Swiss-Prot record:
Protein name: Large ribosomal subunit protein bL20c
MF annotations from Gene Ontology: rRNA binding; structural constituent of ribosome
Family the UniProt entry places it in: Belongs to the bacterial ribosomal protein bL20 family.
InterPro entries the record matches: Ribosomal_bL20 (IPR005813), RIBOSOMAL_L20_CS (IPR049946), Ribosomal_protein_bL20_C (IPR035566)
Biological process terms in GO annotation: ribosomal large subunit assembly; translation
Localization per Swiss-Prot or TrEMBL: Plastid, Chloroplast
Chief location bin: plastid
Record bears the keyword RNA-binding: yes
Amino acid sequence: MTRVRRGYIARRRRTKIRLFAATFRGAHSRLTRAATQQKMRALVSAHRDRGKQKRDFRRLWITRINAVTRENGVCYSYSRLMHNLYKRQLLLNRXILAQLAILNKNCLHIISNEIIK
């Protein structure tokens, strides 16, 4: 059986891995086997952290909204605000409410006072 030279195909595969791992440190950017393992690990981390980022931002938005609504009244909280918003069928999501809480507190106070009535 004759020997098969896999130069082009193998070199193209290794080049793709090296381009992905170019910014990694040490042997992880130079050695093919280490770079392949680090690439798989990086992709797993990216997939996991996309979900984690969504949870983290949701928690941040809730904290910001709650802080501003508690300034408004002593017996008023985030949960009551969201309940009243849904009751009135106002379609304001947490991202928009958090931006209002940071950029324009008065607007959020007006909204919360109107939906209490």
